[in-house]
Amino acid sequence: MEADWRRIDIDAFDPESGRLTAADLVPPYETTVTLQELQPRMNQLRSLATSGDSLGAVQLLTTDPPYSADAPTKEQYFKSVLEALTQVRQADIGNVIKNLSDSQRDVLVKYLYKGMSVPQGQKQGGVLLAWLERITQVSGVTPIVHYISDRRTV
């Protein structure tokens, strides 16, 4: 059954029309992830990063990100992510990115942009830009387009 495209109310989808609220734009989540649930994962992330297993650390942080967590929990988790990303040697970044799946690269780009938008990440701007440069060399701009179009935040 086809929808009559002439009868679609496009103003209902315009965020500036006043019909949509900020809550309407947030994707629904079934459960909320707490800091206590993420703590073992954060500890594992730190131990992988400090032991030199950069591929394992980046794969862990890009697999199943805590989209449904509240803002303070996401911030605590992001600190662990930033620690892990900054401990990877510049020479290893390309190999790590090549071993990630497309969806993991998309999540990594979300963390990189988040890092560039917060003060603790801006201090590591050169490292974050090196990661972003290598991602665009491997995948092109596709992960950046996915970051822009995805409503889920890390």
Curated annotation (Swiss-Prot):
It is found in: Cytoplasm, Cytoskeleton, Actin patch. GO terms for molecular function: actin filament binding; mRNA binding; protein-macromolecule adaptor activity. GO terms for cellular component: actin cortical patch; actin cytoskeleton; Arp2/3 protein complex; cytoplasm. Keywords: Cytoplasm, Cytoskeleton, Phosphoprotein. It comes from the Eukaryota. Its main location: cytoplasm. Pfam families: P16-Arc. Functions as a component of the Arp2/3 complex which is involved in regulation of actin polymerization and together with an activating nucleation-promoting factor (NPF) mediates the formation of branched actin networks. Belongs to the ARPC5 family. Component of the Arp2/3 complex composed of ARP2, ARP3, ARC40/p41-ARC, ARC35/p34-ARC, ARC18/p21-ARC, ARC19/p20-ARC and ARC16/p16-ARC. Present with 3060 molecules/cell in log phase SD medium. This is Actin-related protein 2/3 complex subunit 5.
